[in-house]
Amino acid sequence: MGIFFLQLVRSAIVPLRSEGKWVTRAFLTIAVLALAQVLAGSLWAQEQDSKKILGQRLVDEIAAKHKPDLIYLGLHSQAPKSKKSVIFASTDSGKIGKNSSCADLHVVEKGIPVMEMKGKSTTVLERLLDSSGHTVGLIVVGFNYTDGQEAEAAKLGKQVSEELAQQIPSKNKLFETGK
């Protein structure tokens, strides 16, 4: 984006060269400002990412990797020093902090995955594991799959679950900020 902008500005300024050195200075000023804006945006994004908890960073990373098939990803668990299981990381920020339902908790307790077909989407619920195989919560994954695509949904649900587990050292680490 920044390079394209610079080329666009340069093509607009070059015909004005006959006006003197101010054109060159104007171009350099604009180039420096554009570069500063690009760098500032990158630094801001890094700063925002470092403020997120590990769980949210993993959700963002996995969701981006599996688009467009993955349309929702949410992680449920009890935060340290909490007695309630809530959604603590999600692709839908409006759901963060909402209590886990009894059905959600049943999946965690019994360890039996659930697949729900809802019109044009499929939702898979299963235990969220850490890298040692310990249960740390619940994963809810929504896919852009319809009736007849249950096998694909189950396969991708398992893949997402395994990708998450490999990156979770422990339950408490899910709630820590920073990289």
Q: Where do the PLM segments sit?
A:
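N-terminal secretory signal peptides that target proteins for export/translocation
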Residues: 1-25
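Boundary at the C-terminal end of the N-terminal hydrophobic targeting segment
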Residues: 43-47
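Bacterial N-terminal signal peptides
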Residues: 26-40
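Short N-terminal helix-loop-first-beta-strand/juxtamembrane motif that initiates sensory/input modules
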Residues: 60-81, 174
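Short glycine-/small-residue motifs
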Residues: 137-138
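Extracytoplasmic/periplasmic sensor domains and loops in membrane signaling proteins
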Residues: 90-116, 155-159
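A short beta-strand signature within small-molecule sensing/ligand-binding domains used
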Residues: 120-127
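Juxtadomain coupling helices with adjacent low-complexity linkers
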Residues: 49-56, 143-179
